[in-house]
Amino acid sequence: MNARTLMIQGTGSDVGKSLIVAGLARAFTRRGLRVRPFKPQNMSNNAAVTAEGGEIGRAQALQARAAGVAPSVHMNPVLLKPQSETGAQVVVQGRRVGTARAREYQGWKPRLMACVLDSFGRLRAEADLVLVEGAGSASEVNLRAGDIANMGFARASGTPVVLLGDIDRGGVIASLVGTRAVLDPEDAAMVRGFLVNRFRGDPDLFADGMALIAARTGWPALGLIPHFPEAARLPAEDVLGLRGAERPGGRVVAVPVLPRIANFDDLDPLRAEPGVSVVLVAPGRPLPAEADLVLLPGSKTTIPDLIAFREQGWDIDLKAHVRRGGRVLGLCGGYQMLGTRIADPHGIEGELPEIEGLGLLDVATVMTPDKRLAPAEGVSLPDATPFRGYEMHLGETRGPDAARPLLRLADGRPDGAVSPDGLVCGTYVHGLFADDRQRALWLGRLGAAPSGASYEAGLDSTLDALADHLERHVDLDRLHALAAG
Protein backbone atom coordinates (compact mmCIF):
# COMPACT_ATOMS: atom_id res chain seq x y z
CA MET A 1 0.00 0.00 0.00
CA ASN A 2 1.39 3.39 -0.98
CA ALA A 3 2.07 6.01 1.66
CA ARG A 4 0.08 9.15 2.28
CA THR A 5 1.82 12.25 0.92
CA LEU A 6 1.85 15.92 1.89
CA MET A 7 3.93 18.77 0.48
CA ILE A 8 5.14 21.91 2.27
CA GLN A 9 5.66 24.74 -0.21
CA GLY A 10 6.74 28.25 0.70
CA THR A 11 5.99 31.82 -0.27
CA GLY A 12 9.74 32.33 -0.68
CA SER A 13 13.21 31.04 0.08
CA ASP A 14 14.29 30.63 3.71
CA VAL A 15 10.76 30.77 5.15
CA GLY A 16 11.44 27.61 7.17
CA LYS A 17 10.31 24.79 4.87
CA SER A 18 13.26 22.52 5.68
CA LEU A 19 12.85 23.06 9.41
CA ILE A 20 9.10 22.43 9.40
CA VAL A 21 9.49 19.21 7.40
CA ALA A 22 12.18 18.03 9.83
CA GLY A 23 9.96 18.78 12.81
CA LEU A 24 6.95 17.08 11.25
CA ALA A 25 9.09 14.07 10.36
CA ARG A 26 10.17 13.67 13.98
CA ALA A 27 6.63 14.27 15.31
CA PHE A 28 4.95 11.73 13.02
CA THR A 29 7.77 9.22 13.54
CA ARG A 30 7.17 9.44 17.29
CA ARG A 31 3.55 8.55 16.58
CA GLY A 32 4.70 5.27 15.08
CA LEU A 33 4.53 6.15 11.38
CA ARG A 34 7.22 5.20 8.88
CA VAL A 35 8.11 8.65 7.55
CA ARG A 36 10.32 9.55 4.61
CA PRO A 37 11.37 13.09 3.61
CA PHE A 38 11.50 14.05 -0.05
CA LYS A 39 12.58 17.11 -2.00
CA PRO A 40 12.26 16.77 -5.79
CA GLN A 41 14.84 19.44 -6.63
CA ASN A 42 17.26 21.20 -4.32
CA MET A 43 19.90 23.85 -4.96
CA SER A 44 22.73 23.81 -2.47
CA ASN A 45 26.48 23.38 -2.14
CA ASN A 46 25.93 21.94 1.32
CA ALA A 47 25.54 18.25 0.57
CA ALA A 48 25.54 14.99 2.50
CA VAL A 49 26.89 11.57 1.50
CA THR A 50 24.50 8.61 1.51
CA ALA A 51 25.22 4.95 2.18
CA GLU A 52 24.81 4.29 -1.56
CA GLY A 53 27.80 6.55 -2.21
CA GLY A 54 25.69 9.37 -3.62
CA GLU A 55 24.97 12.91 -2.47
CA ILE A 56 21.83 14.80 -1.48
CA GLY A 57 21.03 18.14 0.08
CA ARG A 58 22.09 18.47 3.70
CA ALA A 59 18.53 19.40 4.72
CA GLN A 60 17.19 16.06 3.51
CA ALA A 61 19.89 14.26 5.50
CA LEU A 62 18.74 16.11 8.63
CA GLN A 63 15.11 15.28 7.82
CA ALA A 64 16.06 11.61 7.42
CA ARG A 65 17.69 11.77 10.83
CA ALA A 66 14.48 13.24 12.21
CA ALA A 67 12.59 10.29 10.74
CA GLY A 68 15.07 7.81 12.21
CA VAL A 69 16.23 6.43 8.84
CA ALA A 70 19.43 6.52 6.82
CA PRO A 71 19.66 9.18 4.10
CA SER A 72 19.01 7.93 0.57
CA VAL A 73 19.66 9.43 -2.86
CA HIS A 74 15.94 9.03 -3.53
CA MET A 75 15.11 11.63 -0.87
CA ASN A 76 16.55 14.35 -3.13
CA PRO A 77 16.72 13.01 -6.69
CA VAL A 78 17.80 16.29 -8.31
CA LEU A 79 20.50 18.37 -6.63
CA LEU A 80 21.84 21.53 -8.28
CA LYS A 81 25.25 22.70 -7.03
CA PRO A 82 25.91 26.27 -8.22
CA GLN A 83 29.30 26.84 -9.85
CA SER A 84 28.70 30.36 -11.17
CA GLU A 85 25.99 33.00 -11.22
CA THR A 86 24.30 31.27 -14.15
CA GLY A 87 25.40 27.62 -14.11
CA ALA A 88 25.32 24.60 -11.82
CA GLN A 89 26.48 21.03 -11.56
CA VAL A 90 23.50 18.67 -11.90
CA VAL A 91 23.34 15.62 -9.62
CA VAL A 92 20.62 13.06 -10.39
CA GLN A 93 19.80 10.29 -7.92
CA GLY A 94 23.13 10.92 -6.20
CA ARG A 95 25.37 11.00 -9.28
CA ARG A 96 26.85 13.93 -11.18
CA VAL A 97 25.47 13.92 -14.73
CA GLY A 98 26.87 17.20 -16.04
CA THR A 99 26.66 20.96 -15.78
CA ALA A 100 24.03 23.27 -17.19
CA ARG A 101 23.31 26.96 -17.48
CA ALA A 102 19.93 28.16 -16.28
CA ARG A 103 18.34 28.40 -19.72
CA GLU A 104 19.81 25.07 -20.82
CA TYR A 105 18.54 23.40 -17.65
CA GLN A 106 14.94 24.17 -18.57
CA GLY A 107 15.26 21.70 -21.42
CA TRP A 108 16.42 18.98 -19.03
CA LYS A 109 13.33 19.12 -16.87
CA PRO A 110 11.03 16.71 -18.75
CA ARG A 111 13.66 13.96 -18.45
CA LEU A 112 14.33 14.82 -14.83
CA MET A 113 10.64 14.60 -13.88
CA ALA A 114 10.76 10.89 -14.71
CA CYS A 115 13.67 10.44 -12.27
CA VAL A 116 11.85 12.49 -9.63
CA LEU A 117 8.69 10.40 -9.87
CA ASP A 118 10.74 7.18 -9.85
CA SER A 119 12.44 8.15 -6.58
CA PHE A 120 9.16 9.35 -5.10
CA GLY A 121 7.52 6.03 -5.92
CA ARG A 122 10.34 4.12 -4.25
CA LEU A 123 9.91 6.09 -1.03
CA ARG A 124 6.12 5.72 -1.06
CA ALA A 125 6.49 1.95 -1.31
CA GLU A 126 8.41 1.76 1.97
CA ALA A 127 6.63 4.40 4.05
CA ASP A 128 3.36 5.33 5.73
CA LEU A 129 3.86 9.06 5.12
CA VAL A 130 6.09 10.96 2.69
CA LEU A 131 6.66 14.61 3.60
CA VAL A 132 7.66 16.63 0.55
CA GLU A 133 9.51 19.94 0.64
CA GLY A 134 9.13 22.44 -2.18
CA ALA A 135 11.89 24.74 -3.41
CA GLY A 136 12.05 28.53 -3.27
CA SER A 137 8.68 30.13 -3.88
CA ALA A 138 5.46 28.58 -5.12
CA SER A 139 4.62 31.90 -6.78
CA GLU A 140 7.41 31.88 -9.39
CA VAL A 141 4.89 31.38 -12.16
CA ASN A 142 7.43 32.52 -14.76
CA LEU A 143 9.15 29.17 -14.12
CA ARG A 144 5.94 27.12 -13.98
CA ALA A 145 6.32 25.51 -17.42
CA GLY A 146 8.17 22.24 -16.88
CA ASP A 147 8.36 22.77 -13.12
CA ILE A 148 9.55 19.75 -11.13
CA ALA A 149 10.07 21.40 -7.75
CA ASN A 150 6.73 22.86 -6.67
CA MET A 151 3.28 22.80 -8.30
CA GLY A 152 4.51 20.84 -11.30
CA PHE A 153 5.51 18.01 -9.01
CA ALA A 154 2.40 18.35 -6.82
CA ARG A 155 0.13 18.04 -9.85
CA ALA A 156 2.11 15.18 -11.43
CA SER A 157 2.14 13.16 -8.21
CA GLY A 158 -1.27 14.14 -6.83
CA THR A 159 0.30 15.47 -3.63
CA PRO A 160 -1.71 18.02 -1.59
CA VAL A 161 0.08 21.21 -0.62
CA VAL A 162 0.30 23.27 2.57
CA LEU A 163 1.66 26.77 1.94
CA LEU A 164 4.10 28.23 4.48
CA GLY A 165 4.65 31.95 5.04
CA ASP A 166 7.20 33.70 7.27
CA ILE A 167 5.88 36.58 9.36
CA ASP A 168 9.31 37.41 10.82
CA ARG A 169 10.48 39.02 7.57
CA GLY A 170 7.28 41.09 7.26
CA GLY A 171 4.57 41.10 4.62
CA VAL A 172 3.22 37.64 5.33
CA ILE A 173 -0.36 38.62 4.46
CA ALA A 174 0.72 39.99 1.10
CA SER A 175 2.95 36.99 0.39
CA LEU A 176 0.21 34.42 1.06
CA VAL A 177 -2.63 36.36 -0.56
CA GLY A 178 -0.33 37.31 -3.45
CA THR A 179 0.64 33.69 -4.02
CA ARG A 180 -3.04 32.79 -4.26
CA ALA A 181 -3.57 35.61 -6.75
CA VAL A 182 -0.84 34.50 -9.18
CA LEU A 183 -1.48 30.74 -9.10
CA ASP A 184 -3.63 29.36 -11.87
CA PRO A 185 -6.88 27.72 -10.66
CA GLU A 186 -5.62 24.14 -11.03
CA ASP A 187 -2.47 24.85 -9.01
CA ALA A 188 -4.39 26.80 -6.36
CA ALA A 189 -6.74 23.83 -5.97
CA MET A 190 -3.78 21.71 -4.79
CA VAL A 191 -3.41 23.89 -1.68
CA ARG A 192 -5.25 22.53 1.36
CA GLY A 193 -4.32 25.25 3.83
CA PHE A 194 -1.60 27.56 5.09
CA LEU A 195 0.80 27.92 8.01
CA VAL A 196 2.43 31.10 9.31
CA ASN A 197 5.93 30.60 10.68
CA ARG A 198 8.24 32.48 13.09
CA PHE A 199 5.63 34.54 14.93
CA ARG A 200 6.84 36.65 17.87
CA GLY A 201 4.56 38.07 20.55
CA ASP A 202 0.94 37.50 21.54
CA PRO A 203 -0.74 35.21 18.96
CA ASP A 204 -4.14 36.72 19.76
CA LEU A 205 -2.93 39.93 18.16
CA PHE A 206 -2.65 38.16 14.80
CA ALA A 207 -5.97 36.32 14.93
CA ASP A 208 -7.54 38.89 12.59
CA GLY A 209 -4.58 38.48 10.23
CA MET A 210 -5.06 34.71 10.03
CA ALA A 211 -8.77 35.21 9.38
CA LEU A 212 -8.08 37.79 6.67
CA ILE A 213 -5.65 35.45 4.87
CA ALA A 214 -8.19 32.63 5.02
CA ALA A 215 -10.95 34.88 3.68
CA ARG A 216 -8.84 36.29 0.83
CA THR A 217 -7.41 32.91 -0.26
CA GLY A 218 -10.16 30.45 0.57
CA TRP A 219 -7.55 28.29 2.31
CA PRO A 220 -8.00 27.29 5.96
CA ALA A 221 -5.48 28.37 8.58
CA LEU A 222 -3.64 25.32 9.89
CA GLY A 223 -1.41 26.95 12.48
CA LEU A 224 0.49 29.98 13.72
CA ILE A 225 3.97 28.74 14.64
CA PRO A 226 5.94 30.85 17.12
CA HIS A 227 9.62 31.60 16.56
CA PHE A 228 11.77 28.60 17.55
CA PRO A 229 15.15 30.03 18.64
CA GLU A 230 16.65 26.56 19.11
CA ALA A 231 16.63 26.25 15.30
CA ALA A 232 20.04 27.94 15.38
CA ARG A 233 21.44 24.69 16.83
CA LEU A 234 20.54 22.76 13.68
CA PRO A 235 22.66 22.76 10.52
CA ALA A 236 21.72 25.40 7.96
CA GLU A 237 21.66 24.32 4.33
CA ASP A 238 21.36 27.64 2.55
CA VAL A 239 24.28 30.06 2.66
CA LEU A 240 21.69 32.64 3.80
CA GLY A 241 21.67 30.71 7.07
CA LEU A 242 25.45 30.73 7.52
CA ARG A 243 26.08 31.96 11.04
CA GLY A 244 29.06 32.72 13.21
CA ALA A 245 29.18 32.64 17.00
CA GLU A 246 31.33 35.44 18.35
CA ARG A 247 31.97 35.13 22.09
CA PRO A 248 34.21 37.50 24.05
CA GLY A 249 37.14 35.62 25.54
CA GLY A 250 36.68 32.51 23.42
CA ARG A 251 39.37 30.95 21.27
CA VAL A 252 38.97 32.56 17.86
CA VAL A 253 38.36 30.43 14.77
CA ALA A 254 38.34 32.68 11.70
CA VAL A 255 36.58 31.44 8.56
CA PRO A 256 36.86 33.37 5.28
CA VAL A 257 33.50 33.30 3.52
CA LEU A 258 34.33 32.11 0.01
CA PRO A 259 31.97 32.90 -2.91
CA ARG A 260 31.20 29.19 -3.43
CA ILE A 261 31.65 27.97 0.14
CA ALA A 262 30.51 24.36 0.48
CA ASN A 263 29.70 22.00 3.33
CA PHE A 264 29.84 24.84 5.82
CA ASP A 265 28.02 22.68 8.36
CA ASP A 266 31.58 21.71 9.33
CA LEU A 267 31.40 24.89 11.42
CA ASP A 268 28.25 24.02 13.37
CA PRO A 269 29.88 21.87 16.08
CA LEU A 270 32.41 24.64 16.75
CA ARG A 271 29.62 27.22 17.02
CA ALA A 272 28.05 25.06 19.72
CA GLU A 273 31.18 25.18 21.90
CA PRO A 274 30.95 27.90 24.58
CA GLY A 275 34.73 28.36 24.64
CA VAL A 276 35.00 29.07 20.90
CA SER A 277 34.29 32.24 18.95
CA VAL A 278 33.60 31.46 15.28
CA VAL A 279 34.25 34.62 13.26
CA LEU A 280 32.95 34.65 9.69
CA VAL A 281 35.18 36.94 7.65
CA ALA A 282 33.15 38.58 4.91
CA PRO A 283 34.69 40.03 1.75
CA GLY A 284 36.20 43.43 2.44
CA ARG A 285 37.36 42.49 5.94
CA PRO A 286 40.86 41.26 6.89
CA LEU A 287 41.48 37.97 8.63
CA PRO A 288 41.54 38.89 12.34
CA ALA A 289 45.03 39.12 13.81
CA GLU A 290 43.77 37.59 17.07
CA ALA A 291 42.69 34.34 15.38
CA ASP A 292 43.94 31.14 17.01
CA LEU A 293 42.90 29.05 14.00
CA VAL A 294 42.13 30.07 10.44
CA LEU A 295 39.85 27.46 8.90
CA LEU A 296 39.68 27.35 5.11
CA PRO A 297 36.34 25.69 4.36
CA GLY A 298 35.20 23.52 1.48
CA SER A 299 34.53 25.07 -1.91
CA LYS A 300 32.41 24.04 -4.87
CA THR A 301 34.90 25.69 -7.24
CA THR A 302 38.35 25.73 -5.68
CA ILE A 303 40.24 27.64 -8.37
CA PRO A 304 37.79 30.58 -8.70
CA ASP A 305 37.51 30.75 -4.91
CA LEU A 306 41.31 30.81 -4.58
CA ILE A 307 41.40 33.73 -7.00
CA ALA A 308 38.75 35.50 -4.89
CA PHE A 309 40.75 34.69 -1.72
CA ARG A 310 43.77 36.50 -3.18
CA GLU A 311 41.68 39.42 -4.41
CA GLN A 312 40.64 40.06 -0.80
CA GLY A 313 44.28 40.09 0.34
CA TRP A 314 43.56 37.14 2.60
CA ASP A 315 46.66 35.32 1.32
CA ILE A 316 48.82 38.05 2.87
CA ASP A 317 46.83 37.92 6.12
CA LEU A 318 47.11 34.13 6.24
CA LYS A 319 50.88 34.08 5.85
CA ALA A 320 51.21 36.75 8.55
CA HIS A 321 49.00 34.59 10.79
CA VAL A 322 51.35 31.62 10.31
CA ARG A 323 54.43 33.76 11.00
CA ARG A 324 52.84 34.71 14.33
CA GLY A 325 52.51 31.02 15.19
CA GLY A 326 48.83 30.69 14.34
CA ARG A 327 47.28 27.43 13.20
CA VAL A 328 45.64 26.77 9.82
CA LEU A 329 43.31 23.94 8.82
CA GLY A 330 42.12 23.45 5.25
CA LEU A 331 39.09 21.25 4.60
CA CYS A 332 38.69 19.70 1.14
CA GLY A 333 38.85 22.66 -1.26
CA GLY A 334 40.55 24.65 1.48
CA TYR A 335 43.18 21.90 1.72
CA GLN A 336 43.78 22.11 -2.04
CA MET A 337 44.29 25.89 -1.80
CA LEU A 338 47.01 25.48 0.84
CA GLY A 339 49.30 23.59 -1.57
CA THR A 340 51.82 24.87 -4.09
CA ARG A 341 49.63 24.50 -7.17
CA ILE A 342 46.32 23.21 -8.50
CA ALA A 343 46.17 21.76 -12.01
CA ASP A 344 42.89 21.33 -13.89
CA PRO A 345 43.83 19.53 -17.12
CA HIS A 346 40.23 18.49 -17.87
CA GLY A 347 38.78 21.99 -17.46
CA ILE A 348 36.46 20.86 -14.68
CA GLU A 349 36.43 24.26 -12.99
CA GLY A 350 36.82 26.48 -16.03
CA GLU A 351 39.36 27.50 -18.62
CA LEU A 352 42.36 28.09 -16.32
CA PRO A 353 44.58 24.97 -16.63
CA GLU A 354 46.71 25.66 -13.57
CA ILE A 355 47.03 28.09 -10.68
CA GLU A 356 49.63 28.71 -8.01
CA GLY A 357 48.46 27.74 -4.54
CA LEU A 358 49.05 29.52 -1.24
CA GLY A 359 52.23 27.53 -0.68
CA LEU A 360 51.69 26.77 3.00
CA LEU A 361 51.79 23.02 2.38
CA ASP A 362 54.27 21.31 0.07
CA VAL A 363 51.66 19.40 -1.90
CA ALA A 364 50.06 19.78 -5.33
CA THR A 365 46.57 18.89 -6.54
CA VAL A 366 45.39 17.59 -9.90
CA MET A 367 41.64 17.88 -10.52
CA THR A 368 40.20 14.60 -11.79
CA PRO A 369 36.79 13.86 -13.34
CA ASP A 370 35.88 11.14 -10.85
CA LYS A 371 34.34 12.30 -7.60
CA ARG A 372 34.92 10.46 -4.35
CA LEU A 373 31.74 10.14 -2.27
CA ALA A 374 31.93 7.89 0.76
CA PRO A 375 31.59 7.73 4.53
CA ALA A 376 35.02 7.86 6.17
CA GLU A 377 36.42 6.59 9.43
CA GLY A 378 39.84 5.91 10.87
CA VAL A 379 42.27 7.62 13.24
CA SER A 380 44.10 10.92 13.34
CA LEU A 381 47.90 10.91 13.50
CA PRO A 382 50.05 10.57 15.47
CA ASP A 383 47.64 10.41 18.43
CA ALA A 384 45.47 7.56 17.01
CA THR A 385 42.25 9.34 18.04
CA PRO A 386 39.30 7.74 16.17
CA PHE A 387 37.11 9.77 13.82
CA ARG A 388 34.02 9.44 11.66
CA GLY A 389 33.22 11.75 8.76
CA TYR A 390 32.81 11.63 5.01
CA GLU A 391 34.64 12.35 1.76
CA MET A 392 33.15 14.42 -1.06
CA HIS A 393 35.75 15.73 -3.47
CA LEU A 394 37.29 15.86 -6.90
CA GLY A 395 41.07 15.80 -7.24
CA GLU A 396 44.14 14.02 -5.92
CA THR A 397 46.73 15.72 -3.73
CA ARG A 398 50.33 14.54 -3.36
CA GLY A 399 53.68 15.92 -2.22
CA PRO A 400 56.34 15.84 0.51
CA ASP A 401 54.03 17.15 3.25
CA ALA A 402 51.55 14.36 2.44
CA ALA A 403 54.21 12.02 3.85
CA ARG A 404 53.01 13.44 7.19
CA PRO A 405 49.28 12.64 6.82
CA LEU A 406 46.78 14.14 9.21
CA LEU A 407 44.56 11.04 9.17
CA ARG A 408 44.71 7.35 8.38
CA LEU A 409 41.51 5.87 7.01
CA ALA A 410 40.17 2.48 8.05
CA ASP A 411 41.18 0.99 4.68
CA GLY A 412 44.79 2.02 5.31
CA ARG A 413 44.85 5.07 3.03
CA PRO A 414 46.59 8.18 4.37
CA ASP A 415 44.68 11.44 4.10
CA GLY A 416 45.78 15.03 4.30
CA ALA A 417 49.08 16.69 5.05
CA VAL A 418 50.87 18.50 7.88
CA SER A 419 53.59 21.14 7.55
CA PRO A 420 57.00 20.43 9.15
CA ASP A 421 56.25 22.77 12.08
CA GLY A 422 52.79 21.24 12.59
CA LEU A 423 50.97 24.58 12.30
CA VAL A 424 49.34 24.03 8.89
CA CYS A 425 47.15 21.00 8.21
CA GLY A 426 44.81 19.90 5.47
CA THR A 427 42.37 17.04 4.94
CA TYR A 428 39.72 15.85 2.51
CA VAL A 429 37.51 14.55 5.32
CA HIS A 430 34.43 16.57 6.24
CA GLY A 431 32.59 16.19 9.52
CA LEU A 432 35.63 15.94 11.80
CA PHE A 433 34.30 18.48 14.29
CA ALA A 434 30.97 16.66 14.54
CA ASP A 435 32.95 13.80 16.06
CA ASP A 436 33.22 14.67 19.76
CA ARG A 437 36.65 13.02 20.04
CA GLN A 438 38.18 15.02 17.20
CA ARG A 439 36.56 18.27 18.31
CA ALA A 440 38.03 17.82 21.80
CA LEU A 441 41.44 17.11 20.24
CA TRP A 442 41.41 20.29 18.16
CA LEU A 443 40.09 22.43 21.00
CA GLY A 444 42.92 21.12 23.14
CA ARG A 445 45.41 22.21 20.50
CA LEU A 446 43.92 25.69 20.67
CA GLY A 447 44.00 25.76 24.46
CA ALA A 448 40.21 25.67 24.80
CA ALA A 449 38.33 23.36 27.15
CA PRO A 450 35.71 21.30 25.30
CA SER A 451 32.20 21.42 26.72
CA GLY A 452 31.97 17.64 26.88
CA ALA A 453 28.52 17.71 25.29
CA SER A 454 27.70 15.26 22.51
CA TYR A 455 27.04 17.15 19.28
CA GLU A 456 24.98 14.32 17.77
CA ALA A 457 22.88 13.92 20.91
CA GLY A 458 22.31 17.66 20.86
CA LEU A 459 20.89 17.45 17.33
CA ASP A 460 18.40 14.78 18.37
CA SER A 461 17.41 16.73 21.47
CA THR A 462 16.75 19.81 19.32
CA LEU A 463 14.71 17.79 16.81
CA ASP A 464 12.60 16.46 19.68
CA ALA A 465 12.10 20.00 20.98
CA LEU A 466 11.08 21.10 17.47
CA ALA A 467 8.56 18.27 17.23
CA ASP A 468 7.15 19.26 20.65
CA HIS A 469 6.89 22.85 19.40
CA LEU A 470 4.87 21.81 16.33
CA GLU A 471 2.67 19.49 18.40
CA ARG A 472 1.65 22.53 20.47
CA HIS A 473 0.95 24.90 17.60
CA VAL A 474 -0.17 22.79 14.61
CA ASP A 475 -3.05 20.32 14.42
CA LEU A 476 -1.04 17.29 13.31
CA ASP A 477 -4.10 15.05 13.16
CA ARG A 478 -5.64 17.44 10.66
CA LEU A 479 -2.42 17.58 8.63
CA HIS A 480 -2.31 13.80 8.46
CA ALA A 481 -5.94 13.72 7.36
CA LEU A 482 -5.17 16.22 4.58
CA ALA A 483 -2.39 14.02 3.20
CA ALA A 484 -3.36 12.09 0.08
CA GLY A 485 -3.41 8.29 0.37
UniProtKB/Swiss-Prot annotation:
Cysteine disulfide partners in this protein: none
Associated pathway: Cofactor biosynthesis; adenosylcobalamin biosynthesis
Chain ranges passing through the membrane: none
GO molecular function, one term: ABC-type vitamin B12 transporter activity
Keywords per UniProt: Cobalamin biosynthesis, Glutamine amidotransferase
Gene Ontology biological process terms from the UniProt entry: cobalamin biosynthetic process
Annotated active site: 332, 430
Domain GATase cobBQ-type, chain residue ranges per copy: 250-438
Pfam families: CbiA, GATase_3
Keyword set includes RNA-binding: no
Family: Belongs to the CobB/CobQ family. CobQ subfamily.
NCBIfam families according to UniProt: cobQ, PRK00784.1
Role according to the record: Catalyzes amidations at positions B, D, E, and G on adenosylcobyrinic A,C-diamide. NH(2) groups are provided by glutamine, and one molecule of ATP is hydrogenolyzed for each amidation.
UniProt protein name: Cobyric acid synthase
Protein's organism: Methylobacterium sp. (strain 4-46)
Record gene name: cobQ
